[in-house]
Amino acid sequence: MGSRLRYGWWPMLLGMFGVVPAVAGVRFEVRAPAGTPPDAVLWISGDVAELGHWNGAGLRLTTSPEGRYVGTVELPPGTAFAFKVTRGDWGTVEKTATGGEIANRPGRASAGEDTIRIEVAAWRDAFEKAPTRTSTITGNVRRHPAFPSRFVDARDVLVWLPPGYDAAPRRRYPVVLMHDGQNVFDGATSFLPGMEWQADETAERLIRAGRIPPCILVAVANSPARREDYTLEVDPRYGGGRSDRYARFLIEELLPFLDRTYRTRTRPEDRTVIGSSLGGLVSLDLGLLHSDVFGRVGSISPAVWWADRAVVTRVTATGHRPVRVWMDIGTAESTPTADGHREWLESAQALRDALVGAGWRVGRDLHYEEIEGAPHNESAWAARFDRVLEWLQAER
């Protein structure tokens, strides 16, 4: 009864008075195939934040008394989305009965509750082992696995050294620190197979062409607590809210280690921090709150919408900082709702306006760009990373 009151009756009652509800419920009912492990947890993974942005998980389903897997997600009315069913990762994604690929399943949130019923024919791991992925790392890379911390979970750190590093023992280099490090250098560890930033190849090409000065790239892997690490505030929908601890890890533990181990420059203008999505959000916060450490910020496709655009309020309260900021957003990063609202794009525009209002100057210490048709994934970010790196590393 509670579910019907929440999703089934109240939208109709509101509609009688001309009120459009802010959210609509989409209920999933999944029938799993024979042979599904009895302790399996099923997930709906899709292309919107509420479904995990294709992270292999997203919305966790629970088992109903009838033995089906059920769950409900709230979305703005009119939101179109695509999804698949998994058991928590892409190695266990749903397949056809003969092991073939299935197309992304479509869905749309309407004003009332919609129920989407799915029959999973088979799971990927019933037919094949996940293919071995070949490493695509290039250049002089040093590995620091399971780097320990008092503040956050241990994680791998990869350090890419520029051409000529070993041959110039007296030279020191600026540092570019990048979040979601699994996606930065290596298609074998990237979130989606083969979709990596190609930061190592791009940096080497720019350095050899004289378009940027030689620099050290540091790829810092995420952890299962990614939302917590990359967000300062708790979002009532998703949790999070511990990036102050992640900042302490970077500033008090990782940077001192890098400075002891490698020939780094340590002025704020010689330290750049770059990330995408929630990584773009935490990059901006690191610049705002620790401008004495990080003087250059790459905020790529930032999740400005997090916690009711809290970062926009923070920019206004904090005011201008001596930090150079690259910020961009793809126009295809959020599916329009029925009324044309696009949360990612409009939130990025609000952040741009707040930065300008606080004193950042477009073309001087702020670059803002909307990339027509660009989606929210590593391939799109790789396609523009050369311009990001060149603008941030340019001497000014």
Q: Where are the language model's segments positioned?
A:
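A short, amphipathic beta-strand motif
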Residues: 26-32
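Bacterial N-terminal signal peptides
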Residues: 8-19
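C-terminal catalytic histidine-bearing segment of alpha/beta-hydrolase fold enzymes
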Residues: 328, 334-336, 343-396
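Conserved acidic catalytic loop of the alpha/beta-hydrolase fold
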Residues: 249-268
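A domain-start/cap signature at the N-terminus of enzymes
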Residues: 102-174
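Primarily recognizes the serine-hydrolase "nucleophile elbow" in alpha/beta-hydrolase
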Residues: 267-320
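Aromatic-rich carbohydrate-binding modules that target alpha-glucans
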Residues: 34-78, 88-110
